Amino acid sequence: MEYRRLPKLSSEINAQNMNLLDVGVAGVGSEGPDPREVELILEEILSLMQLGEDYTEFMVSKIKGLSNVDPDLAPRATKSFRSGSFSKVVQDITGFYVILEGFFMVENVRKAIRIDEHVPDSLTTSMVDDVFYVLQSCLRRAISTLNISSVIAVLSGASSLLSNEYHEALQHKMREPNLGAKLFLGGVGVQKTGTEIATVLNNMDVSSEYVLKLKHEIEEQCLEVFPAPADREKVKSCLSELGDMSITFKQALNAGLEQLVATVTPRIRPVLDNVATISYELSEAEYADNEVNDPWVQGLLHAVETNAAWLQSLMTANNYDSFIHLIIEFLVKRLEVIMMQKRFSQLGGLQLDRDCRALVSHFSSMTQRTVRDKFARLTQMATILNLEKVSEILDFWGENSGPMTWRLTPAEVRRVLGLRVDFKSEAIAALKL
C-alpha cells in the first residue's frame, strides 16, 4: 500500500472532488491522478484482493480441519482470524479499491461525454458505446474482486452516473430552441439538422437497450460469484435501480419523439383540413369517380412521406416505428373528429371504408408494428356507415361481435348511425345496445 502510495492517492482523489458523482463538474478538465495510471493500480489491487480471498478461504478451511483440537476452538479461531491484522489489511485495500474504481469510472465516463462525436456509418454518437464499455469494464472488475461491498459500491456509482451526467448529456441537444424551424428551413427537410435530432433519439433508444443488457450480464455473473442469499438480495436491489434507468431513458426518448412529431404535424395539417371539405353524401357516379380520382387519401400519404419518411434512414428501426405511430395517432384523432361532423350516404360509408383500407395498407408498409389497432375506431365507423339498415348493427354487436372488439361506446355507435342521411332517428333511439 505504501509502495503504491494508496493512502495519498485516495486522499488526492477525495480532495479533488468530495463527491465523485457531482453533476456540476461534468466535462471540466481538472488536475488530479492520471486515470490510466489508476487503472494499472486497480489491476494490481484486484490481484491482491483475489489472493487475499484465496488465502482467507485456505486458512479458514485449515482451521476447520483441525479435528484433534477442542471443537469449540475452531469457531473462535476462525473469528479471530477474520478480525485479525490480515483481514484488516484486506479491508483497507478494499476501501482504496472502491475509491480508485469510482474515480476511474467517473473520469472516463466524463471524458466519453466530453469528446462525444459523430461516428461514420453509425446511428449513434461515440459516447454511447464508450460510456457503457467503461461501466461494463468497471463492474466486471468489481465482481472479480469477489467482494460484495465493492460490487455494491461500483453498481451504485454506475447508476448515479447514468441518472445524472449521462442522462443530462443525452437530453442536451433536444433542449435547443427553434428546433422545428431548423428542421424544415426553407420549407424542406434539412439533412444535417435531421441527422442531429435523429442521432440524439437513437442515443436514447440504444442506451435504454444497453442498460438492460448490462443489468442482465451483471446479474448472471453475480449469481455465479455470490451464492449467499443475503449477497444476492443486495445485488438485486442495486440492479433494480440500474434497470430503472432503462425506463428513464425511454421516457426521455418518448418526450423527444413527441417533440419531433410536433415539428412535422403542422406541415401535414393543411392536407387534413382539406378533408373537412370533402363530401361523403355520394351518388353512384361520384363514388365511381372517387375510385379513379382519389379525393384526399393519396394527398395525405404524400404529405406524410415528404415530411417524415426521409428520416427513416437516420433513425433506429424502433425509433422510426414509434415516430410513425405517433404521426398516425395525430392523423386518426383528427380524422375521427372530421368524420363525426359529416353526413354520409351508404356509398359514403363504403368510401370511408375504402379510405381506411388505403391508409392501413400504406402505413403497414411504413412500419414493422401493426397499425390496424390505431385505425380500429375509424374502421368501425365505416362498418356502421355501410349498413343496409339500422337494425343490422345488432348482427355485429354484443354476442354477435365475434373476434371483433368494439372500440366505440354504445352512445358513439348511435351517434355514428345518426350521420347516415337515410337512417331514421326513431329507429336509432329504439336500438338496445
What are the residue ranges of the model-derived segments?
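Extended alpha-helical "rod" scaffolds
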Residues: L42-T56, V60, K64, T94-F96, ...
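Short, charged, low-complexity loops and linkers
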Residues: V28-E39, R82-Q91, R114-H118, Y280-N290, ...
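Alpha-helical solenoid scaffolds in eukaryotic proteins
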Residues: V28-R36, E43, G84-K88, D92, ...
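Extended alpha-helical scaffold segments
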Residues: M1-E107
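Extended, low-charge, aliphatic-rich alpha-helical segments
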Residues: F81-S85, V89, F104-G187
